[in-house]
Amino acid sequence: MIPLLRLAALTIFAGTFTFLSPQSAEAHRGAGEPLFVAAGGVDQGRCLDEASPCRSLGYALSVAGKGAEIRIAEGTYEVGNPEDLFHVVSGMIQVSGGFERRGKRFLERRGISTLTGVPPQFRELLKGKGFNVVSDRKGIDGPKVAEAEKLVALHSQMKAGMPASPCTGGKAGEFDCQAVDLLAHFSFTDVSASPESATDVWGFVDLNSRREYAIVGYDIGTAVVDVTDPENPLEVGFIDGQPAFWRDIKVYQFFDTNDDRWKAYAYVTTDGSTDGLFVIDMSGLPHAIQKTTYVSDFFAAHNVYATNTDYSTGIALTNEPPLLAISGSNISSGQYRGYTLQDPAAPAFVAGASSADYMHDASSIIITDARKDSQCDNAAAWCEVLLDFNELTIDVWDITNPSSPARLSRTPYANAAYVHSGWWSEDKQHIFVHDEQDEQDFSLNTTVRVFSVADLRAPVMVGEWSGTTRAIDHNGFVRGNRYYISNYAKGLTVLDITDPAEPVTVGSLDTYPFSDNTAFVGAWGTYPFFFSGTVAVSDIDTGLYLTRDRSIEVPQGRFSFDAASYAGDEGQSALITVRRTGGSSGNVSVGFEAVAATAANGDHQLQSGTLEWPAGDAGDRLINVPLVNDGNAEGLEQLLVRLVNPTGGATLDQLNVTSVYVNDPGALAEVGFFEESVATAERGFATAVLVLQRSGSATGEASIDFAVTGGSASPGTDFDGETSGTVAWAAGDGNPKNLVFNIADEGGDEDTETIEVSLSNALGAGIRGAGTATVEIANGSGLNTAPNAIAGSGQTVAQNNVVVLNGSQSNDPDGDSLTYLWEQVSGPQVGLSSTSSPVTEFTSPTVSSDTMLQFRLTVSDPSGLSDSATTTVTVTTGAGSGDGGSGGGSTSIPFIVLLVLCRSLRRLAGHDTREPLHKSWTAYFRPDLCRGSLVERMALDDRLFAIGPG
């Protein structure tokens, strides 16, 4: 029987749930929230409810979310194994003891929690965390001490950076591995902003230079890292942001005909702060990046995805501009929102999903087979399908018409705990789905489910893969017949998906060697789409790893092009050679497809197709690319051709993308500098890259000599690099070449120095432009870098209260003093106590309903460079939640209604509103509204509710 008050809550709930929306706080259950442990507790659920804590430290560690804090009440607790001891002493998960427990509440740290099973050498460290250590024999004896000390030492080493190491005998240095080499570790100490944790990673190949870049999210911003030499990564720049545990990144690259060059933008969403969507202009690469002034219409979102893009370069796959698919924003229920990139610097909202279902992550497929006509609603020459992973189901949408998305199907599955993300196979017939909570909720080993999408309107589960540990699978991406998974505590996992329904483990690199449990630690993201074959991995706890996958070395052979570039005149054909190397076992095949760069579909007649080899045949195959003579003088145009979907067990080698350059008939070849003036500094990137480009024609051989012919910088003292030599292009090679100079930091204050490089003795080509380039080198203080504005996290406060805006965390990379300017952007006008101080305050206005105010902080350095950041303050009619901006949308809920709902949901869910049994409730009700506020404290106070057991 349901008690009367609970029944009333159910009735109120039924009538008011439309005001409540599930937001990104539900997206990673337990992430960034305190966990509670107390003697007499029960090890079940996620330890999020202080009224119903867990019993053991080990259990709490196993379910801790990203950025979690574990609060331990007074009492005695055993540290059962070296892994738990490591997590306590290393600080990778914040653990605090000594909380006084009064009734069902954890009060401030006033007492002592006693730990047993801990060696005495950790006593002083743990004392500062509120613990008393009892050094019993169990804690002193055996391999436990040695193992814990080894883990602590390894953690310190990893923070400083791990050396490159091939995978030999199951080890790559200190990491367990299988067929994956460690090329480089770009640790937190290598990042100029000194972050403490990493989030997601994406990447792209800059078509101006063919240099490769990883874009890495961190807790305090986003870095662009040059990984062209994967053994020596270098940070190009860092864009500061508000502190947050979640950042997601995608890229769009396009050719600007007015400037005759490629331009690229990175799009960064942040959850847990009010940064909204950052747009980073990367068109200044290889030397600089900058954040644009774009202001998004949302202030928080969990994920971003760029539809209709090639994952290696970020260029559009069709003649339509890509859409940004925003997942889990603070607007409405966090459902899909589409933004056109018609103006890449200013994404503009087009339309969103018609349903109110929170979308956590997304992927998309361009369908060109018969399904586009029989199964899509809006298809024309193609159908663009969006895969919507929305916590409870996998939804498939037709977004071919961006302004009118149509849902084609909704697919649940057994043991669904949290439908998180997924990717598609290159035959476009299967998707691989990640559930982020099934390992915890159902005690499963790592599980990836495989669905057939032969019928887009009725996907069917056809298989699954289970790992050897319970580590959580996070995200995955397909390249050929390899599936690369960021496997949290297990690091990088590589699957062979030759048979998509039966994936097989073929590679791994354990970037988190401390445990393989179900905690949210270790590898967050991975990116396997670089032309070079480098695979990037972002690890929450230790930063960026660059790896090489050797699982592609198989007896069936590897497919690759025999050159990175080919060329032909309009009206003729280009012949491309595809090789099978490393083995010839079995019957195999590989597909190929065109990706338009500057050569549009009307410039060639290449159709996608398949090449086949019988067993024992290792001969070459040819792809004929007819080039159309359109009669227009267009300059040298570029087409990309990609090998895809290998079958029979053969794999894609590193060179699976090539360029075909289309010459105007009779055009003459020229060689010149991409930019004739570049600027760099002795610090920071400390590298000068001069890009040489070939234009006009790429059909014959060409070469040119270069030499340092002037400038005030001295070779060997001020810079290192070749001071003279010859750069050559083979026949058909139209790809850019790079001259690289490493700049030395001499220290002290000196004038700007220069390097002058001249071109001469061109063979097979003329010299374009002046044939001279100048590098300007700023002294040890570096080029003046724009400051970083940090306006603080969003706040929720009650009306008529004092609100403090704190911008004191703003900083200048050059150490310059800053000036401050606070401005109110939106909302009822208030009076700021100061507009020119780092910290200002105001009194929240009287409001009739919950109202959001937005403020902008602009900081400027003495040279005039500036940066801006915004923050929000939501003013409520009642008591403020003080949640610091959890990313939830505005709500107008009577306090007593919210109070009753919180209380009832906690009772129904066994003191945990996030238990899987009650997903039907939490799909409509935001459990995060019940935490960290007066509502929570009252809802947990039994004296206010005489509710008997139901």
Regions found by a protein language model. Name each.
Residues 24-59, 76:
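Right-handed parallel beta-helix/beta-solenoid
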Residues 35-39, 60-78, 93-99:
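Glycine-rich repeat segments that build the extracellular carbohydrate-interaction surface of secreted
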Residues 69, 80-114, 126-130:
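Beta-solenoid repeat scaffold
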Residues 108-557:
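Feature marking well-ordered beta-strand scaffolds used for ligand recognition
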Residues 814-821:
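Solvent-exposed loop segments of extracellular immunoglobulin-like
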Residues 821-842:
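Surface-exposed, flexible coil segments in extracellular/virion-facing regions
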Residues 892-912:
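A cross-kingdom C-terminal cell-surface attachment/processing module
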